[in-house]
C-alpha cells in the first residue's frame, strides 16, 4: 500500500513537527493496522527526522493522550483523540475524487420512485465504503398505494405489506378473525387489487373472506393516511451493517454489540442526521463523541453529509464504521455521493412534479391530506346493510 508522504515544511516549530508526526503516524496506522515504531515512521516519509527525535515526539504525544503504547518494546497506536485531530485536519481539504466515479450511473435514473433510488444509492455507498449506511429523506407527496400483499404469520396474524407508487414499503400486522387458506389469501389480495385499480369486481370470495377483505382494506387505508399525514420523523433507510464483520477492529463482540445498538437505534440515527442537515456541512463523530446518542460508549465512528434538492438541504447520509477508517478517502467519497444524489433527486423531483416536505409536529390534517382522503383510489368501502 502506498504511503502518502508529508509535504516538506521549512523552519517549522516544535508544535508543527509534533503535529506532522502525529498525522503521519495516524495515516500509516490507518493503512496498515499495525503499531508504528520510530524507525517505521522514519522510513515512511520522515527521513528528515532522526529516530530519536521521533521517539521523543511519540513520548510527548503519548503524555498528551494522543498515542498509546501496546507494550514496552512495541510501537504506538492512535487514540480517539488522535483520530479526531486527523479527521479535522482533512475535513475541509479538497482531496481529489476517484478517477472513475462509482456513482456515475445515478445520473441516468429517471423515475418518480425516489424512495427506491435512495435505497439503492445507500446500498451502493455501503458497497464502496465497506461501512454501514443510514440515510434520511423528506416525505415525497402525491404518493398513492399501488399494491397490498398478505403474508400469514400464524393462524391468528397476518403481515400486510403496503407498496406505493414511489417505491415506499410499509408493513402492518393484522389480526385474523378466521383461519384462511393460501387460496383465500390470494382471493383477498385480488380484492385489494380490484379496489385499488377500480378495474373489475372481486370474484369467488367466500362470505367470511369478503368480510375480512373489506375490514383489512378499510383498516390499511386509514392507517396509511394517518401515517402519511402525521409526518413527525424523517424516513430512514439503513443497510450494510454486516460489512462491519470484515473489520478486524470488530472481532471483539463487545465492540460490535455497542456499534450495533447504536445502528439499530433509529432515534439516534435520526438525531445524528438531523444535526448534520442543520449544520449543512460534512460532520464526524469518533468514539466518545457518540456517547450522548447511545446507552454505552460506542467504539466506532460516524461520518455524515447533507444532500440537496435545488441547493436546499433536505436530508443527510451517514457512514458507520470502526474508528480506524480512511477518513481522507471517505470524506472525498461522501462529497461525491452527495453531489450525485442531489443532482439526481433534484432532476426527478422537477421532471415528475413531485412535492416534498419535512417532518412537522402538528397532528392536524392539512388541506392536501384532506383532499388525499377524498381521492377515488382511497375510497373506503362499507357494505354493511
UniProtKB/Swiss-Prot annotation:
It comes from the Bacteria. One of its GO terms (molecular function) is DNA binding. Gene3D superfamilies: 3.30.450.40, Winged helix-like DNA-binding domain superfamily/Winged helix DNA-binding domain. One of its GO terms (biological process) is negative regulation of DNA-templated transcription. Keywords: Repressor, Stress response, Transcription, Transcription regulation. HAMAP family: HrcA. PANTHER family: HEAT-INDUCIBLE TRANSCRIPTION REPRESSOR HRCA. Negative regulator of class I heat shock genes (grpE-dnaK-dnaJ and groELS operons). Prevents heat-shock induction of these operons. Belongs to the HrcA family. This is Heat-inducible transcription repressor HrcA. It comes from Protochlamydia amoebophila (strain UWE25).
